[in-house]
Regions:
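Cytosolic ligand/metal-binding cores
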Residues: 18
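Phosphate-binding loop of NTP-binding sites
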Residues: 10-14, 22-173, 181-183
């Protein structure tokens, strides 16, 4: 896939479809051009189920530590990687591998983590942020995190987090201030 920077309408030619992130505004010149040309446009949130549906997804969410945790996981698990920061191990935020495994940094900012189909869900913490997406409603925010965890077969949580510690889910509970050897 060719990446063209900066954004320009000339980049939109005859693509089958366009995928855009939550950071892209509706008036983005490429998104506007794609719509003018009748090209289907999908948000990252909408396309995730199709990208991850047949994969064994190792998903990491949380307000802090997602990229670090995801990069560490990516060094341990053979497979594709989609994370938020550049991995020092492979020099990119993405790695493709012919494997069913995908290490995925799950995004709670737009609740797209609910579309990530996790086999394993790790939540480093559930500190309230991006509250505008949740209508400034803590119950909605926490329900999204709980929903993310409920979708996974295996769950790992920070048992010292104020919210996560209250969940009545079967999960590996880590206590980072004292002991992380329970994995």
């Amino acid at each position: 896939i060719e990446v063209i920077t900066p954004h320009c309408k000339e980049a939109i030619k005859d693509q089958d479809f366009v995928v855009y992130s939550a950071a892209i505004k509706e008036d983005n010149i490429e998104l506007v051009e794609a719509r003018i040309k009748g090209i289907k446009c999908f948000s990252r949130k909408e396309i995730l189920p199709y990208v991850l549906e047949d994969k064994c997804v190792f998903a990491v969410a949380g307000a802090h530590g997602k990229s670090t945790t995801s990069a560490m996981l990516a060094s341990l698990i053979e497979g594709s990687v989609i994370i938020g920061a550049i991995s020092k191990q492979f020099g990119s935020n993405m790695r493709y591998a012919k494997s069913d495994n995908v290490v995925f940094e799950a995004d709670e900012s737009d609740s797209s983590f609910l579309n990530s189909n996790p086999y394993l869900a790790i939540v480093t913490n559930a500190e309230p942020e991006h509250m505008e997406h949740y209508d400034y409603d803590l119950a909605k925010f926490y329900a999204a995190y709980k929903g993310f965890l409920e979708r996974a077969k295996v769950r790992v949580i920070n048992a010292e987090d104020e919210f996560l510690s209250t969940l009545k889910l079967d999960a590996i509970r880590l206590y980072p201030s004292t002991d992380i050897t329970e994995l």
